[in-house]
C-alpha cells in the first residue's frame, strides 16, 4: 500500500448560528473553500472530491458544491454522512483510495450550515407523522430516542454515569476559550484560514469568559443538571478541505507534504453514551499504531461537550497538556461535516507551532460513533 500525504488545506472562519454566514447556503460555503484550496496550492489535476455533510439538503450536496466551485464536470464528487465524524471519515476514505492506487489526489473534508439547515417533516405514511406542520431538525440516531434535544440528553446521561459535575465541565470551558483567544493573538491557525464570504473571525471565541458568567447559566434541559449553553458547543456554519495525495503526485507537481497518515480507526459505542466515542476512538487508533498517549504531541479532540475533556483527562491523565492546546470546539465551534478537517488542519498547524512530530485527531458522532486518525509530520 502507498504512503498517504496531506499536503495542507484551508478552512473558513467558523460562524455561529444566524451569524455572519446566515444567508450562505452550505454548498456555497463549501464551494468557496474548495476554490481557495485549489488556487492556494495551484492544483492542476484532481481525481475526486469527498465531502462530509450532516444537516444539509441531501442530493449529493458535495457534487453541487464542486460544480459551484467551477470544477470540471469530469471530476466526480461524493457526500459522506457519519454525522459529526463525516469530515474525518471523508478524509479516511480519500486516504484509502490513494493508498490502494485508486486515486492520486483527492480533496476531502466537509461543510455544514446550521443557519440554513432545512426543516423536515415525516411523510403521512410514516408512523411518526403528526401533521404537516410537525417539523423536525434532528434525525433519529438510536431506537430508544427521537427528539430535538437527544444529543443534550445523551450528554446529561453520560455526565451522570461518569459522575462528572458542572464545576468540572465549566473548568474545561474556561480553558478552551482562554487557549483559543491566545491562539488567535499569536496567529497560530491563520495560515490555514480562507476568509471567504466576508468572514473575519471565528465568531464563538470568548477569551474573556469568566466563572461568574458560567455559574449564572441555567441547564439547557428543563430536567437537566449539568449541561449548559456554555459547556455544550454552539451550532455553527463552516467549511474545510485538505489535499490527500500520493508521494508520486506530490513529487510530480512539486508539492511539499505537511504530514503523512499513520493510522485510522472507526468505532462504535452505546448511542446513549455517544460522547465516549471520541476517547474510545483515540485509544483504538493508538493501539493500532503501536503508540502510547505520551507519544502524541497534540491531541485535537472535538469537544462537542466539555465532558469529553474530562473523559480524556481520566483516560490519559499524563496527556492533558497535549489536549486541544490551542482551544477546541467549545470556543471555535462545531460545523458538523467540516469539523474533522478542521481538527486535522489545527493539528498540522499546531505541530508546526510546537515543532512536534505526531498528532491524533478524534471525534465522537451521533448514534454512538467514534473516528480517529494519527498523523506524522513530514
Stretches with model-predicted labels:
Residues 82-112, 159-189, 242-248, 335-356, ...:
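Active-site-proximal alpha-helical scaffold in enzymes
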Residues 1-26, 212-276, 280-283, 288, ...:
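Condensing-enzyme catalytic core mediating Claisen C-C bond formation in acyl metabolism
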Residues 11, 23, 27-32, 40, ...:
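N-terminal extracellular/periplasmic Venus flytrap/periplasmic-binding protein-like
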Residues 105-157:
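Flexible glycine-/small-residue-enriched beta->alpha junction loops
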Residues 53-104, 145-150, 211-234, 315-342, ...:
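Conserved catalytic cysteine-centered active-site region
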Amino acid at each position: 500500500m502507498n504512503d498517504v500525504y496531506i499536503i495542507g488545506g484551508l478552512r473558513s472562519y467558523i460562524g455561529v448560528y444566524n451569524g455572519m454566514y446566515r444567508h450562505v447556503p452550505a454548498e456555497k460555503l463549501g464551494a468557496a473553500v474548495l476554490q481557495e484550496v485549489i488556487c492556494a496550492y495551484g492544483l492542476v489535476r484532481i481525481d475526486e472530491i469527498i465531502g462530509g455533510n450532516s444537516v444539509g439538503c441531501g442530493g449529493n450536496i458535495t457534487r453541487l458544491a464542486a460544480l459551484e466551485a467551477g470544477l470540471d464536470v469530469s471530476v466526480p464528487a461524493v457526500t459522506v454522512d457519519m454525522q459529526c465524524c463525516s469530515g474525518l471519515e471523508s478524509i479516511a476514505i480519500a486516504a484509502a483510495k490513494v493508498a490502494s492506487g485508486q486515486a492520486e489526489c483527492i480533496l476531502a473534508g466537509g461543510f455544514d450550515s446550521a443557519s440554513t439547515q432545512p426543516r423536515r417533516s415525516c411523510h403521512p405514511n410514516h408512523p411518526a407523522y403528526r401533521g404537516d406542520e410537525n417539523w423536525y431538525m434532528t434525525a433519529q440516531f438510536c431506537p430508544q430516542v427521537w427528539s430535538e434535544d437527544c444529543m443534550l440528553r445523551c450528554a446529561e446521561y453520560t455526565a451522570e454515569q461518569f459522575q462528572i459535575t458542572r464545576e468540572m465541565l465549566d473548568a474545561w470551558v474556561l480553558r478552551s476559550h482562554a487557549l483559543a483567544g491566545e491562539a488567535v493573538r499569536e496567529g497560530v491557525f491563520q495560515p490555514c484560514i480562507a476568509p471567504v464570504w466576508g468572514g473575519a473571525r471565528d465568531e464563538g471565541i470568548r477569551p474573556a469568559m469568566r466563572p461568574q458568567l458560567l455559574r449564572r447559566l441555567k441547564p439547557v434541559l428543563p430536567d437537566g443538571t449539568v449541561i449548559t449553553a456554555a459547556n455544550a458547543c454552539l451550532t455553527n456554519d463552516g467549511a474545510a478541505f485538505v489535499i490527500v495525495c500520493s508521494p508520486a503526485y506530490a513529487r510530480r507537481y512539486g508539492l511539499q507534504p505537511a504530514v503523512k497518515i499513520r493510522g485510522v480507526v472507526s468505532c462504535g459505542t452505546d448511542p446513549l453514551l455517544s460522547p465516549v466515542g471520541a476517547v474510545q476512538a483515540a485509544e483504538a487508533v493508538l493501539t493500532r499504531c503501536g503508540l502510547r498517549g505520551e507519544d502524541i504531541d497534540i491531541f485535537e479532540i472535538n469537544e462537542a461537550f466539555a465532558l469529553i475533556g474530562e473523559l480524556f483527562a481520566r483516560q490519559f491523565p499524563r496527556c492533558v497538556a497535549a489536549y486541544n492546546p490551542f482551544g477546541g470546539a467549545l470556543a471555535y465551534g462545531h460545523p458538523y461535516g467540516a469539523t474533522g478537517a478542521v481538527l486535522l488542519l489545527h493539528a498540522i498547524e499546531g505541530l508546526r507551532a510546537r515543532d512536534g512530530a505526531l498528532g491524533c485527531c478524534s471525534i465522537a458522532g451521533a448514534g454512538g460513533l467514534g473516528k480517529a486518525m494519527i498523523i506524522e509530520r513530514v
